[in-house]
UniProtKB/Swiss-Prot annotation:
Described purpose of this protein according to its UniProt entry: Catalyzes the specific phosphorylation of the 3-hydroxyl group of shikimic acid using ATP as a cosubstrate.
Domain of life: Bacteria
GO biological process: amino acid biosynthetic process; aromatic amino acid family biosynthetic process; chorismate biosynthetic process
Keywords assigned by UniProt, alphabetized: Amino-acid biosynthesis, Aromatic amino acid biosynthesis, ATP-binding, Cytoplasm, Kinase, Magnesium, Metal-binding, Nucleotide-binding, Transferase
Molecular function via GO: ATP binding; magnesium ion binding; shikimate kinase activity
Gene (name only): aroK
Top class in the EC scheme: transferase
Iron keyword on record: no
Positions of Mg(2+) binding: 18
Compartments reported by the entry: Cytoplasm
Any one GO cellular component localisation term in the record: cytosol
Protein's UniProt name: Shikimate kinase
């Protein structure tokens, strides 16, 4: 029996990784997993609380461990946290264990999609959300592109249409 393939979605917060990932999983009859939700399940606390208690460094260590475990599964669609690509270990595991899709999204769309979401610790600062998102994009975009097998823009169509575009590009 052939091994089931994995699809890993990377990109900034507000790119639609979870929404698009669910559509892909439904259509391909795969399991959908969100790495942030898995961290919350394992810790029994929300991401903001983990950030408050352990800082970003502690959170990233948990994220690295969780993504390491999840990428060992077969037949999943995984929505990763926006900063997960900062870890070389995570990038290596994503590349080695599945097809990586970078969901590229302009800053304006990210701001619009995240402005009322209080569950994003990196945006809960004195710094303007747009400035935070621009800084994060500068740091992370080269890493998203490095790890991606292909790039899909998410700003001009519905999540369902984007999911279909991704499925068309997959060699399943």
């Amino acid at each position: 029996m052939a091994e089931k393939r994995n699809i890993f979605l990377v990109g900034p917060m507000g790119a639609g990784k979870s929404t698009i990932g669910r559509h892909i999983a439904d259509q391909l009859h795969l399991e959908f997993v969100d790495s942030d939700q898995e961290i919350e399940r394992r810790t029994g606390a929300d991401i903001a609380w983990v950030f408050d208690l352990e800082g970003e460094e502690g959170f990233r260590l948990r994220e690295e461990s969780v993504i390491g475990d999840l990428t060992e599964m077969q037949g999943i669609v995984l929505a990763t946290g926006g900063g997960s690509v900062m870890s070389k270990e995570v990038r290596n595991k994503l590349s080695a264990r599945g097809i990586v899709v970078y969901l590229e999204t302009p800053i304006e769309k990210q701001v619009a999609r995240t402005q009322r979401d209080k569950r994003r610790p990196l945006l809960q600062t004195e710094e303007a959300p747009r400035d935070v998102l621009e800084r994060l994009a500068e740091e992370r975009e080269p890493l998203y592109k490095e790890v991606a097998d292909f790039v899909v823009r998410t700003d001009e169509q519905s999540a369902k249409v984007v999911a279909n575009q991704i499925i068309e590009k997959l060699d399943f």
